[in-house]
């Protein structure tokens, strides 16, 4: 049964048991039991830890003894959860039953660990003894750190945070603050990038996560952020919500993360906690402005895996208040959506494969023959009348399939199978519109969500069949309680030209052609022409070759306008064009010319 202290909103059981079923309740016996868990069998280890924690939380124990035993369990729970993550991270957004159960098991393990530390807090809270201040601080810090695990995992899975979790985090910090132990140093062996964390620093980690717009981030970036917040939490402090610098405030009576101060009435500020993120944002922006060679000397503490894209996102999320440019309108109807650069390129190109997009689009003039001319060899033994010759048929190709619109292909035609295969590779989805604005849409996934869907992914949108495809990006994803999965789509451009893009290198061989999209300039809003490229290998200053329907021209990529984990968008300027012989089509690298021609082709560019 759960007990809620009259002065505390911490959910804990009332211990009633005198013994453990699996060993004696001594540090020596618990240590031996933990050391002999079947670590090679992760499932069995998790089961025994789960049952062991439940029993431990029902056991009547003095505070010091409980803390000793929990400290032995803590690294084992951390080990199991870290190794179980591969079963549910980097999967489809909506998990199948097995990975969902594994994720729930990790949540339960860390929740039961947190319950153990909350029992210490509840037992110690009435004593108010200075001699036991350090023990009280350790109990609160460990409870906050244990609750942080389910919060990070919910963010990574785009799920709602467990009910009551934010309330308990706020309550734990307030208890520490009231006793004056919130800034006591607490050693923490599980902290990866600092020897210890005070209660205030431990509390700042979930607060900063809560206002970092994690639903716009990818799972690996959320994990890196949670790590780097350990050293970053030392750069900030909790202050009064009434101070001018408090951009975000947390209201302890509200079960939710910090929000912009301007969203709360003045009457709620008196009891609220404020966060001034400006010192951290200034360090991030200072790092971003430094030349690459000098970033190692920057004042901002960093860890491996924190990318420039992540820093730019955090600079925006923790910077000045973001205001919605357009008002949302409740939507109705559906949109057709495709996911990823390859699919969008394919549909923009009229369902043509990439190698065809790179060829010169010509309608060869059909040769004219006189039917009444007598062939001197017509009577030869091996002469056979050609009945299936097609005008403009390339003589070096064995088979030629004229391009036809998918609508014109009969179901029994051999090409119907090829087009069916291509469509299976690039599926489309009809999604209901939740709401919309001139800047984008909120769409709902009523059924299974494809594994490819991630925040920052490029998508194509089509209003009606046969209409042009618009270019957009997935800005955020969330799972709604009893409401499936929703995502926010931001429009990039109403149209684009599919093309091939090749990175030109001076000292090595140039890259193969990769899919890219050309977006025209819009003079009315002073927007220059841009190109959307894959995330790698292109960067600012890269010299590239653009292949548009077989016509090649060179360009230089200038300022990067946008970047996600899937694509980059660059401004570009034309460089010296490369003239393509009109009698020789340009094809993708997979379509190899004869050996002699290939050797000469590589020679022309090096002369």
Curated annotation (Swiss-Prot):
| Region annotation PilZ-like domain: where it falls in the sequence | 323-492
Feature: compositional bias, Polar residues: 568-582
**D/NXSXXG motif (motif): residue ranges:** 435-440
Top-level taxon? Bacteria
Tell where it localizes: Cytoplasm
* Gene Ontology molecular function: nucleotide binding
- Tell me yes or no: is Chloroplast among this UniProt entry's keywords: no
What's noted about domains in the record?
Contains a PilZ-like fold that binds two molecules of c-di-GMP via two well-conserved c-di-GMP-binding motifs, RXXXR and D/NXSXXG.
Q: Where is this region: Disordered?
A: 568-607
Q: Which UniProt keywords apply?
A: c-di-GMP, Cytoplasm, Nucleotide-binding, Virulence
State how changing residue 437 to A affects the protein, per the record. Answer: 9.3-fold decrease in c-di-GMP affinity
User: Where would I look for the motif RXXXR motif in this sequence?
Assistant: 324-328
Q: What name does this protein carry?
A: Cyclic-di-GMP receptor FimW
When the coding gene is removed by deletion, what phenotypic consequences does the entry describe? Answer: Mutant has reduced surface piliation and is unable to increase piliation upon surface exposure. It shows defects in initial surface attachment and in early biofilm formation, but late biofilm formation is not affected. Mutant loses walking motility but twitching motility is barely affected.
Which regions span the lipid bilayer?
none
Q: How does it assemble?
A: Monomer in the absence of c-di-GMP. Forms dimers in the presence of c-di-GMP.
Where is this chain primarily localised? Answer: cytoplasm
What gene makes this protein? Answer: fimW
| Stated consequence of mutating residue 328 to A | Cannot bind c-di-GMP. Fails to localize to the poles and to attach to the surface
- Under the cellular component aspect of Gene Ontology, which terms does the record hold? cytoplasm
Q: Any idea what job this protein has? A: High-affinity cyclic-di-GMP binding protein that regulates type IV pili (T4P) elongation. Required for T4P-mediated surface attachment and walking motility during the early phases of surface colonization. Not required for twitching motility. Does not bind related nucleotides such as GMP, GDP, GTP or ATP.
């Amino acid at each position: 049964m759960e007990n809620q202290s009259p002065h505390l909103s911490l959910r804990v059981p009332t211990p009633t048991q005198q013994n453990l079923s699996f060993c004696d309740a001594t540090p020596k016996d618990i240590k031996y039991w933990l050391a002999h868990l079947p670590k090679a069998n992760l499932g069995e280890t998790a089961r025994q830890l789960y049952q062991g924690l439940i029993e431990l939380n029902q056991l009547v124990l003095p505070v010091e003894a409980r803390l000793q035993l929990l400290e032995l369990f803590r690294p084992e729970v951390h080990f199991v959860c870290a190794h179980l993550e591969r079963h549910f991270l980097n999967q489809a957004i909506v998990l199948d039953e097995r990975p969902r159960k594994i994720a729930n098991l990790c949540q339960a393990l860390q929740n039961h660990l947190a319950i153990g530390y909350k029992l210490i807090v509840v037992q110690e809270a009435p004593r108010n003894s200075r001699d036991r201040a350090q023990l009280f601080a350790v109990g609160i810090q460990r409870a906050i750190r244990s609750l942080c695990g389910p919060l990070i995992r919910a963010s990574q899975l785009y799920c709602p945070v467990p009910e009551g979790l934010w309330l308990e985090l706020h309550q734990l910090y307030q208890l520490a603050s009231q006793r004056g132990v919130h800034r006591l140093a607490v050693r923490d062996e599980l902290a990866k990038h600092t020897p210890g964390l005070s209660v205030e620093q431990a509390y700042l980690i979930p607060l900063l996560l809560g206002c970092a717009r994690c639903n716009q981030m990818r799972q690996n970036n959320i994990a890196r952020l949670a790590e780097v917040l350990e050293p970053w939490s030392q750069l900030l402090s909790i202050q009064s919500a009434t101070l001018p610098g408090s951009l975000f405030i947390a209201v302890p009576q509200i079960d939710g993360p910090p929000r912009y101060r301007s969203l709360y009435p003045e009457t709620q500020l008196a009891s609220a906690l404020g966060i001034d993120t400006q010192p951290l944002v200034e360090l991030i922006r200072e790092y971003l402005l430094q030349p690459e060679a000098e970033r190692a000397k920057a004042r901002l503490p960093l860890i491996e895996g924190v990318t420039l894209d992540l820093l730019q996102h955090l600079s925006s999320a923790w910077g000045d208040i973001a205001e919605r440019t357009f008002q949302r309108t409740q939507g109705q109807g559906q949109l057709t959506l495709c996911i990823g650069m390859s699919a969008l390129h394919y549909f923009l190109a009229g369902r043509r494969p990439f190698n065809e997009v790179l060829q010169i689009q010509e309608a060869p003039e059909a040769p004219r023959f006189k039917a009444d001319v007598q062939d001197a060899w017509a009577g030869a033994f091996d002469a056979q009348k050609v009945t299936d010759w097609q005008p403009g048929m390339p003589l070096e190709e064995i088979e030629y399939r004229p391009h036809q619109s998918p609508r014109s292909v009969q179901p029994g035609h051999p090409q119907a199978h090829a087009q069916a295969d291509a469509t299976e590779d690039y599926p489309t989805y009809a999604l209901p519109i939740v709401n919309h604005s001139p800047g984008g849409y909120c769409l709902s996934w009523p059924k299974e969500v494809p594994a490819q869907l991630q925040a920052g992914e490029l998508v194509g949108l089509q209003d009606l069949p046969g209409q042009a495809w618009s270019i957009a990006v997935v800005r955020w994803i969330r799972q709604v309680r009893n409401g499936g999965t929703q995502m926010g789509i931001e429009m990039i451009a109403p149209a684009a030209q599919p093309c091939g893009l090749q990175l030109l290198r001076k000292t090595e061989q140039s890259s193969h052609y990769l899919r890219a999209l050309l977006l025209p300039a819009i003079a009315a809003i002073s927007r220059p022409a841009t190109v959307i490229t894959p995330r790698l290998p292109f960067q600012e200053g890269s010299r590239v070759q653009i292949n548009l329907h077989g016509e090649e021209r060179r360009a230089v990529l200038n300022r990067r306008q946008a970047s996600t984990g899937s694509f980059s968008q660059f401004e570009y300027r034309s460089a010296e064009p490369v003239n393509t012989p009109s009698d020789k089509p340009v094809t993708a690298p997979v379509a190899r010319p004869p050996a002699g021609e290939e050797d000469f082709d590589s020679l022309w560019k090096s002369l």
